[in-house]
Every structure is written in C-alpha cells, then in structure tokens.
Amino acid sequence: MPDPATYRPAPGSIPVEPGVYRFRDPHGRVIYVGKAKSLRSRLTSYFADITSLAPRTRQMVMTAGSVEWTVVTTEVEALQLEYNWIKEFDPRFNVRYRDDKSYPVLAVTLNEEYPRLMVYRGPRRKGVRYFGPYSHAWAIRETLDLLTRVFPARTCSAGVFKRHKQIDRPCLLGYIDKCSAPCVGRVSAEQHRQIVLDFCDFLGGKTDRLAKDMEQQMTAAAEQLDFERAARLRDDISALKRALEKQAVVFGDGTDADVVAFADDDLEAAVQVFHVRGGRVRGQRGWIVEKSSEPAATGDADLGQSGQEQLVEQFLTQFYGEQAELGSASDTGGDEATNPVPRQVLVPVLPPNADELATWLSGLRGSRVSLRVPVRGDKRALAETVQRNAQEALAQHKLKRAGDFNARSEALQSIQEALGLADAPLRIECVDISHVQGTDVVASLVVFEDGLPRKSDYRHYAIREAAGDGRSDDVASIAEVTRRRFLRHTSDSQPDPSAEQRPRRFAYPPNLFVVDGGAPQVNAAAAVLEDLGVDDVAVIGLAKRLEEVWVPSEPDPVILPRNSEGLYLLQRVRDEAHRFAISYHRSKRSKRMTASALDSVRGLGEHRRKALVAHFGSVARLKEATVDEITAVPGIGVATARAVQEALGVAPQNGTAPDPAPGTGDPQTPADPHSAATAADIEDDRHATGATGPQMNGSEQQVDRV
C-alpha cells in the first residue's frame, strides 16, 4: 500500500484559489474527486494527521498514489466540474446515488398515435411524460387500477394492441370498461388522446377542475333521466376521491418542493426525499450510502463543514445533476409537476456554499431555485416526517448490516490468514468452465467486492483455442481465460497517470483469483500470470466435493474448517461462477440447436431470413425453389438468391440466365457460383430492392463480451 508521504505535494506548490482535485491510485485510475474553496487548505489537511481522518477517507489516502488539481474561477464552476469528473471517472471512494434506473415511474407515451400508460424503469425518452418516482411498482399499478375506471386509457403493449386490432375484439379491460378500446374503434385517436391528456392533468395536480366537471356531468345526466350514466359518473367521482386520499395535501399553498432529510452514523448515511408537487406528495425515494467525509481544517469556511452539510452538498450536486440530464431527454410538456428540479429544495442544514449551489440548481432548472431550511408550519412538519423515515431506514439497515458486515469481515480475514495474504482480499474474481461433452465450451468470470457480488463486472467467454470439434481441455481453458482476462488488465493500465480516460470495468486487478478446480487448474492459471508478469495477484483453486483450497506449487491443499466464514464465502463465489457459466452455456447451446442453414449466408440478415422462410414455409421447400422463385421474395436479389442456394447445397438452377463469367465476353459461359454471390453483389441487391441496411446475423455476433 502506498505511503502518503511519497506523493504529498509541498504546501507552497498548492494554489490557494478554488478548484477541483483528483486522487489517483498507483495505476493512474481516479479514485476520488473533490472540490475546495481553497485547494491549499483542503489538500494539506489530508496529510496533516492521517489517524484523525474518517475511516473511509483514511483508506482513500492510503490507497492513492498521486494527487492533482485544476484551478477554477468560481465555486459554481467547481461544482459543475466536480459533478462532470465524478460522472466521467466513477471514482470508487465517492458517494454515488445510483437509482435512476431502478425506481419505477408512471410513463405516458404521448409520442404514439394511441398513447399508453405503463410502469417504466430506465433512461428518459423524448415524447414521453413521466410521473413519479414511486417507491414500488405495485403503487403505480394500484394507481392505474383506480384511475383507469375514470380515464379508460390504453395500458397494453404494442403487440397486444396489434393482435386485438387484427381480431377486432377488445381485451378483458375493454369489456369491463377500464379501457376505451381504441384497438377496435370504440373511440377515435383524438378522443383517446383527450382521455390521456385528462389523465395527465389529474396527475399534474389539476384535480379540482376535473372533479367539478364530472359532478356537473352527473347532475346533467340525472336531470335527463340517464340514471345509468349518472351512476357511472358517481362511481368515477368516488374513485377519484379515493385516489386523492392516497395523496394527502401537505402544503396548502400548492408548493412544488423536494424535502430532503438525512440520518447518519460513523460509516453510512440514510437519505430520504419526498417529492411534493402541487402541494401533494407525488413520490418518495431513499438511499443508504457510505460516508466520504472531507477532512476538517481551520482557516477555511468550506473545510469546517459538518457531516450533514457535506451530505447535503454531495446529494444536491449528484442527484439533481443526474435528474436534469434525465429530464432533458423526456417530454415534460412544460408541466411543473414533472420538472426534475423543483422551485424549492428543503434541506435540514445549509452548506457554506448554499448560494453557489442555488445558482447551479437554477441553471439546471432554467429559473430560480430556492434552497431553504424549513423552520415552522407545514413544511417543518413534513421535514420532521421525512427525518423520521430516514432514521427508520438507517435503523433497519444497521440491523441487517450488523450481521452481514461482521460475517463478511470475518470471512475476508479468515481467507487472508489461511492463505497468508498481506491484505484482506477485498476483490475476488472466480473462473468456471461449462460444456457438455466438449460442445459449446464457455467460461464465466464473476467478481465479488467486499464479500458481495458486483454483477456489473461479470463476464463470460467463448473458449476459442482450448476447445472445438468435440474436444475440451479444462486446464487449457482455464489458462486461456486467465490470459485473456489479464491481457485486458495490462492493456487497460495507463502508464501516464495524467491520461484523461475513464477506467474500464477491469481497471482494478483482483486481490484473489479463484479457479474452479484442483492443482492442475490452479498451476495453469499461475503459469499464465507469471508469463504476463503479474505478481501482485494471489491464485487459488477450490476443488469440488472435498472443498479443498489448492495453492500453486504446493503438494497439499489448504483445508479450511467446515464452519469457516472464509470457506462459505469461497463457496458462494464458486457457486455463482458455476451458475453464470451454466446460464451462458445453455443460451449458446440453444442458439446452436435452433440455428438454420441460412445463418451462414453472408449479408442475409434476420428479417430477410424470416421473409424467406415465411414465403416458402420451410427450408426444405426453399431448397427446391429456383433463383427466379427466390427473387420473388421482397428484398432478395439474384446474387443473394444464388448465395442462399449455395449455402443450402443446391446446384444452380436454370430458372434464370446465368451471368457471364468475370473476365470473359462469352455470355454462354456460366459464372462460377462462388464468384457470383460476392458480398458486393449482395450489398447491391439490397440497395437495388430497397431492403434495409446490412444486418449482422446470429453467427456473426461477438460472443466474447470482454
């Protein structure tokens, strides 16, 4: 582990202006990004007394190998640069609020002819309005179940809508009047869009007008003795009231605000946000994050921040920066209810740079944003409610963490002691091979960090050299995967620490590399690492049945106690690698078993393959077809037709006159079928017939994701 004294900059060389700084590890990867009103005061405080730093901050300083900085002119500029760098480099020691793709929202696809209401997770899209986020998907479905009685808009997928349109019969929701059934023409596209717009107005807070309109319609229907319609409107009004009861009014003045609260301990913090739009709570979300405290120092206001002030600043910059980007990709329709940055943000404390934060948020919103601490009235009462939610979330997490964290720490320490490692194996990678009698030989690589799976770093491999033609060599396969994995690591390494490049997924080498197998497998992996010059990664093998831990060049295995937490962790890692390898093997085998002879035709994409089979009914009938019959299929030219016949092993038919052979002027000399269907000819076919651009078939897709 690097010594901070080896890279500590001289205090006189650090500027006193505001700026943004980056800590890098010995491999040159950015591990932490921060900003400061005075770079000299902030950076000096990191090295003044290492023991006084917070545990996570101390670990960061001990892990780093260099520090660099960029001077800016204003704190607003520093906020923006800090946010951009955190997003670009994804530093491992920065707090990240990652939930934008996991929290569900209610999406309304206004960009379609018949807009649809649906539960959605993922990046925002143009032409779609979003309401939420909701804490659970069932909350959205419950809302839809209530409101589709009043606003019978379409909720089905495009495939279901198309199928019912073809059979001219509505789905069950159409029969029970929870859908206006535009698929069968019960309402026109304009009428259905108006239903959807009324639905959006209701969720946007325009509830009083809709309720009054429905009451007037109910009264008019009763006066006209249309009691059936009046009763239906009465039930619809009741449904609206029930929906409104679920969104109680918290601000009588119709305020749009986000109410933020924190509860923290020495290691972690719970964050809770209530989204209030139109005076009603429209959504709620929460996080549990690891604290990354800045060191305190004297003589600089922004270094005297409390833990809560730092949490507020980190949350505002990261959360609203992400939300503004998501909102810019969606269609908010100018509706205040769906604006990702509200007029007010209510926080428990104001950080020293509150004015700069408010200016930055105003720039994201496009109008003034007020950053305030509620002190009385309804806003103070709601802030206390959010605070209680944060405290409850942290208490529940600590109960779970107490068991999980202690067990994981004990497991890592047990492995370290049993294998004689210098440090605990915080990052463990495991390789497993999967095949059936030498066919579809694949490998998996799974990653565990701090004893927990990191699925974003999982990889699978199609074995290229050590398998094929029904043969399989597990030892050679392990060696191949090890070589490919660590070749990627060495190629990703940045010799120049100043290189401006975001680290890839495998920028960090593992502390422990586990292979599924015994002495032969682990010795093969160790030999590869030695060839590549990788000497800072420990390698072991975990043999099945007896659960023996094999170490390279050792005649006897290491036996961990059966009740050892370290053995349990290694088993979980091995079993996860086994599961991931089997799932990929099954997928690959399924694709092979359902492969068609047409897959090998170069330039013939999936759509044209399906068109051929649909036209002739089967590949057997396609074999019997002439070139003229094949070219009758839209998008298929003569060259492609001949390539199809060649792939199917069919001799050239006389259904059409052959082209002259290249280089001869004799039109009666038949061209070589291999030269007739070149890739260029097939490409010409596609352009000549108006077919779509080149498509990659299944056999040409890159299987190896690494």
Curated annotation (Swiss-Prot):
Keywords: Cytoplasm, DNA damage, DNA excision, DNA repair, Excision nuclease, SOS response. Pfam families: GIY-YIG, HHH_5, UVR, UvrC_RNaseH, UvrC_RNaseH_dom. GO terms for molecular function: DNA binding; excinuclease ABC activity. Residues 651-706 are annotated as: Disordered. InterPro entries: GIY-YIG_endonuc (IPR000305), GIY-YIG_endonuc_sf (IPR035901), GIY-YIG_UvrC_Cho (IPR047296), RuvA_2-like (IPR010994), UVR_dom (IPR001943), UVR_dom_sf (IPR036876), UvrABC_protein_C (IPR050066), UvrC (IPR004791). Its main location: cytoplasm. Residues 16-95 form the GIY-YIG domain. PROSITE patterns: GIY_YIG (PS50164), UVR (PS50151), UVRC (PS50165). It is found in: Cytoplasm. Residues 692-706 have a biased composition (Polar residues). Residues 208-243 form the UVR domain. PANTHER family: UVRABC SYSTEM PROTEIN C, UVRC/OXIDOREDUCTASE. HAMAP family: UvrC (MF_00203). Belongs to the UvrC family. The UvrABC repair system catalyzes the recognition and processing of DNA lesions. UvrC both incises the 5' and 3' sides of the lesion. The N-terminal half is responsible for the 3' incision and the C-terminal half is responsible for the 5' incision. This is UvrABC system protein C. It comes from Mycolicibacterium smegmatis (strain ATCC 700084 / mc(2)155) (Mycobacterium smegmatis).
